[in-house]
Regions:
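Short beta-strand/loop element within the Bergerat-fold HATPase_c
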Residues: 39-52
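Conserved glycine-rich
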Residues: 100-101
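Short alpha-helical Gxxx[C/S/T] motif in the catalytic ATP-binding
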Residues: 88, 92
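Short conserved segment of the HATPase_c
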Residues: 65-76
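A residue-level detector for a conserved hydrophobic packing site
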Residues: 19-20
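Acidic ATP/Mg2+-coordinating residue in the GHKL
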Residues: 60
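Conserved catalytic submotifs in the C-terminal HATPase_c
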Residues: 1-10, 49
């Protein structure tokens, strides 16, 4: 796992326990996505843009999420995992909204979840 925080003194004004729950959920999903891939990688990057918005990106190089699944992943109880509850991403998105931020999925070569704090 690769972690990059720029600048090193980023401060997010939000409930630490709730945001930790979101990050842990996304990291667990990333670990499951890469499975036993020998070249599997997870990256966590935190940064601040020119508008002073803080972005936390959690990226993995597991299998691509198909469009028909991606459009449903934030819906409560939607899951493709055996034994999964389908509430993790929905709760994570609700936590981010209550914290004045957002949680989005970016699908390119790798799967990236972006937490944005305004």
């Amino acid at each position: 796992m690769h972690v990059e925080i720029t600048p090193a003194d980023l401060i997010v004004y939000a409930d630490e326990n709730l945001i930790s729950q979101v990050v842990i959920n996304l990291l667990k999903n990333a670990i499951q996505a890469i499975g036993n891939q020998p070249d599997g990688k997870i990256e966590l990057k935190a940064s601040c843009n020119d508008m002073e918005e803080i972005w936390i990106e959690i990226k993995n190089n597991g299998p691509e999420i198909p469009s028909e699944i991606a459009e449903h992943i934030f819906i409560p109880f939607f899951t493709t995992k055996e034994g999964g509850s389908g509430i993790g991403l929905n709760i994570s998105r609700q936590i981010m909204r209550l914290s004045g931020g957002s949680l989005t999925l970016l699908r390119e070569k790798e799967t990236t979840f972006i937490l944005k704090f305004n």
